[in-house]
């Protein structure tokens, strides 16, 4: 019996709304995370929810490694109707995260990042779609199977708390939890996107991410601009010169060859097919100002640009006063945070070296520059095994009434690339609820509740297919 919206409202929504009130920002945005306890409180809340579920055999454990964010691990042993053991069929690893992006105030009238608001079938709050719902979807999917007497495989639900910071704690936990994970045969990631809310969307690729914090110093202190300008180079101009080494300011194209990769012809074909059926999906959800011209030559080209091309965004800046407090001063420094998205096949370490060298070698005018550069690899899904390809279609039809969709995404989930390296040959289903107007990372983040229910039911269908699969 499929899970209904009423089931989700009764079983999951109260705890999800409590989670929404916790300002559990990812450690990269909250240097006091270890002392303020927000991530710990969110982890304990989700662990309590897991303990409240009715499984035949399950272990719920919060793991805490010194100096690292906590990880929630729920192991649910297989229920089978034959003589096979857990090891005979392998483990399904279900992944999500509980850390949140910064609140990014102000939100729209009547909404607040840490005050959940229900409007129709949509829940507004920071982190509910990215990725708070995932713990509930994974647990309820397995529980529904047990309630209906449907055999399921051994499942390990792994919920981390540093994903939004690039998952710096992930590798240590994967090493630590290796014995508990067992032989992972299928990985289901619930942190990805959806182009529409009418079907299950499966992610075929994700871009990598490079994060750089750059500071340019030209003076020990600010000086009257009438005295210093024309003599001392502006730190902002030096910044512009350095950024020109990375990006062509006229076109937005990245000029460092290390940040590019060959784009498979299949990507162009798939993008054209998605654009033909669904239109300009890459730009349709953007709150563009009137008259703005988007990049790209066509709907399909914009899909490719968003998923397989490198890009640069300046996401933060220091050293510049607010406009109403700006005096006639040549400022001593400029600091920026650079966010670069890397194509799925680009090597992150090679990209880090190229960007660091571009920012710190032969700096104009001999300005003092410091650059902290880190990156995470992108990911491209292996071809689905026949049984899984069929299961995904059945899951979408049963849960949504329409065939599954397949598309690349422009974001980053470091866990997928990491797991693919650790378990060669593992099968992946990356999906999620981040569809139109879900506003992940932005103001007014929203979870479409019927989609959360649909994804939950789809997961159950895929788990059932895993149990009965033929690995030919």
Explain the meaning of each model-derived region.
Residues 127-205, 471:
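Acidic/histidine-rich catalytic neighborhood of metal-dependent amide-processing enzymes
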Residues 223-232, 324-327:
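A short glycine-threonine-serine/GTX helix/turn-capping micro-motif
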Residues 52, 83-159, 454:
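Active-site metal-coordination/substrate-binding segment of hydrolases
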Residues 2-106, 333, 337:
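N-terminal helical capping/dimerization or prosegment-like subdomains
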Residues 172, 229-250:
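A short core secondary-structure module
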Residues 43, 196-197, 254-333, 344-357, ...:
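An extended, acidic, His-containing surface patch that forms the Zn2+-binding/catalytic region
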Residues 203-217, 428-431, 435:
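Flexible glycine/proline-rich, aromatic-decorated loop/lid segments
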Residues 67, 98-100, 158-167, 190-195, ...:
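Acidic, glycine-rich active-site loops and adjacent beta-strand->loop/helix elements
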